[in-house]
Amino acid sequence: MIIKFNFDWICFDTKYAFSQIETYFEIMNGQIEDIKKKNMESIRSLLENVKDIEDYEFQSSTLFQEHYHQYEENLPRCLTYSFVTMIYTTLETRLNELCNDLFKRKNLKLALKNLKGSLADRVELFFKALDLKGLGKKDIDKITEFSRIRNQIIHENGQMHNATKKLKNYVKNKNNITTKNNQLVIETSYCLEHLKYFKKMFSNAFKELGYKQDYTIETNEKKDI
């Protein structure tokens, strides 16, 4: 039996990679919510057995502060930081794969690995030098801005003490990123916004570059996969 895939595998792999990140986040976020709820129930159960008023006030204050710090600040921050890191890693990997595939497919004379600079700089130069369609200025700007956030997380654990003026202005003008105690606080919406954008960016790029994205297969009849 002959099976015909009506898509290029690089398109499928890219779509799947970003979908996996979204699934991971949904699972992890749900687990944090469950643990948070159980911890609050444990605190209330423990406090029910405290009869002395002063002791109750001391323990409740301590336990509720610890709960807030852990489940409203620490864990959400760790989750969104890991989310940003995973999105960036996938973005970098898939851009490398796209450029390498174009290099082989079109028998180009310039490879991405021969270029220097940031991820956005190298990709922009690669597309411009070879007069390729698919990625525009808005896409490059998005990659650049997201890279700065990722780098601040990786190299400074989100601390903004040594942040560049460009990064500070970017954070100041975004409504889903703030700072608290001079550390980045990233909302879930920021991560989902960029995950959605990069998925669409690749889809548009594949279309303009002539890749097949009809995610169906054919044998004796056409079936969705």
Named regions from a protein language model:
Residues M1-T85, K137-T144, R148, T164-I225:
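Extended intrinsically disordered or low-complexity regions, especially N/C-terminal cytosolic tails and loops
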Residues C78-L98:
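Ordered, amphipathic secondary-structure segments that act as subunit-interaction surfaces
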Residues T90, R150-I153:
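Conserved short aromatic-hydrophobic micro-motifs
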Residues L95-R148, H155-E156:
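Short non-catalytic regulatory patches outside canonical folded cores
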Residues I154-T164:
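Substrate-binding/catalytic groove segments of enzymes
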